[in-house]
Amino acid sequence: MTPLDILILGASYGSLLATKIVLAGHNAKMICLPAEADLFNAEGAIIRTPVKGRDGLVEIRTSGLAGQLSAGGPADANPAEFDLIVLAMQEPQYSSPGVRDLLHSVAESCVPCMSIMNMPPLSFMKRLPNMNIDALRPCYAESNLWDAFNPEKFTLCSPDPQAFRPPEENLNVLQVRLPTNFKAAGFHHAEDNAMLRRLQADIEAVRFTTDDGDTIELPVKLKVHDSVFVPLAKWAMLVAGNYRCVQSAEMRPIQAAVHTDIDQSREIYNWVVDLCVSLGGAPADFVPFEKYANAAQSLGSPSSAARALAAGAKNIERVDKLVQTVAAQKGLQLASLNETVALVDGWLEKNRAAG
């Protein structure tokens, strides 16, 4: 079969999925900054990941793999030429010059589009039943950017694998901290789902030969689910962990956010899961708190949202506010979530006032 051609907007977190795609024999093009593109085109992507049963990290380089990896700027891609488009930037970045024009071209192309953002685009929220979309608009940096998309051609994939760029390394190096799976909701149309499930099967079939000659199965798969609620499993994790890294004076690691008061974390987490079930999800769509809390033990640094605020960011993804707003549509609120939203608002106001 002809390899799939997949366009990925964003090369930091996006390089992880891009590497899985290229390992499976398909082609990926990443849209990123010029310095990143030059590096990816010259050297490929380098992913370092823990593998169960092995000591240390396994290094995967995309150069020489079955598929082709390339990179360029927003003007270097025609979305209509691709089989699938993946959105892997932080939500406020889609407002930047060049990227917003490319996003509009993506919508106009009607090519199936899958978000691996923490913040589910408004186009996906339209697939959830009985959702007041206009009430959600203030949660987005620029909500009208998502209006041109056909929700039937749009889906969400939960970005569960935790990864970071080691600060001492080049921009094409990504280190996986928590090698869990990408969990995607299916598309509306059968032919789009067939393409997504083909990608899932090809990624699962990959066997990788290490430097010492061992043939191994790699973690971080793509799992496609029928339920549109499965990717929302990330909401409880973000609200109980990532956003609670934000404190009034400083940031704390995710591990501390979850484990300093484990009972409160459990209450928040289960409240968000219950909210998602009330929207139409099944309890089996979501991750039990104990499993999440155990994984959080290894997350010894603040979340990317918290780090961005501490570095002076004037906009970040607001999943905290989105969950608060969705809950309000159900007549629900949680004091600790309100407190978190207020803390994030305060940091953003301070950063914006600083100019």
PLM features per residue range, with description:
Residues 1-52, 122-123, 219:
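NAD(P)+-binding Rossmann beta1-loop-alpha1 motif at the extreme N-terminus of oxidoreductases
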Residues 2, 168-180, 194, 198, ...:
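NAD(P)-dependent Rossmann-like dehydrogenase/reductase catalytic/cofactor-binding core
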Residues 5, 84-93, 283, 319:
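Domain-wide signal for the mature, well-folded portions of proteins, strongly enriched
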Residues 17-18, 96-99, 124-126:
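Short glycine-/acidic-enriched loop or helix-start segments at secondary-structure transitions
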Residues 18, 37, 99-104, 324:
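Short amphipathic alpha-helical segments and helix-helix/interface helices
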Residues 29-82, 103:
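Conserved N-terminal Rossmann-fold NAD(P) cofactor-binding segment
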Residues 76-121:
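Rossmann-fold NAD(P) dinucleotide-binding segment
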Residues 80, 114-241:
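Rossmann-fold dinucleotide-binding core
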